[in-house]
Amino acid sequence: MAKYRKLGRETAHRNLMLRNLVTCLLRSGRIETTVTRAKETRRMAEKMITLAKRGDLHARRQVLAYVMDETVVNNLFTDLAPKYAERNGGYTRIIKIGPRKGDAAEMAFIELV
């Protein structure tokens, strides 16, 4: 059984796509994507927020290695981490919004709680 979804992409493309999705989610707080991409984005976004809650230098460097925008990382450590200090996981919510018009792919919003 696979530990992650392959999303029909090669490894490098999939990892870069997920890094972009996580960066956009942390920047804007809400993005629209397919349900399967949202589920994979949730895994990594929750890991980044948990690292930010630790707040030490090593955690910041680990997040900087994954998130593509330094201002997003600063926002994550200064604003979002204190907001979720009392919450043990479950930082995101996926809301299904129905099929996409072009190819009927199941779409969803993923947002920070």
UniProtKB/Swiss-Prot annotation:
Gene Ontology CC entries for this record: cytosolic large ribosomal subunit
Organism: Clostridioides difficile (strain 630) (Peptoclostridium difficile)
InterPro entries the record matches: Ribosomal_bL17 (IPR000456), Ribosomal_bL17_CS (IPR047859), Ribosomal_bL17_sf (IPR036373)
Family: Belongs to the bacterial ribosomal protein bL17 family.
One BP term from GO: translation
Protein name per Swiss-Prot or TrEMBL: Large ribosomal subunit protein bL17
Alphabetized UniProt keyword annotations: Ribonucleoprotein, Ribosomal protein
GO molecular function: structural constituent of ribosome
HAMAP family: Ribosomal_bL17 (MF_01368)
Pfam family, one: Ribosomal_L17
Subunit structure comment from the entry: Part of the 50S ribosomal subunit. Contacts protein L32.
Keyword NADP attached: no
Domain of life: Bacteria
SUPFAM superfamilies membership: Prokaryotic ribosomal protein L17
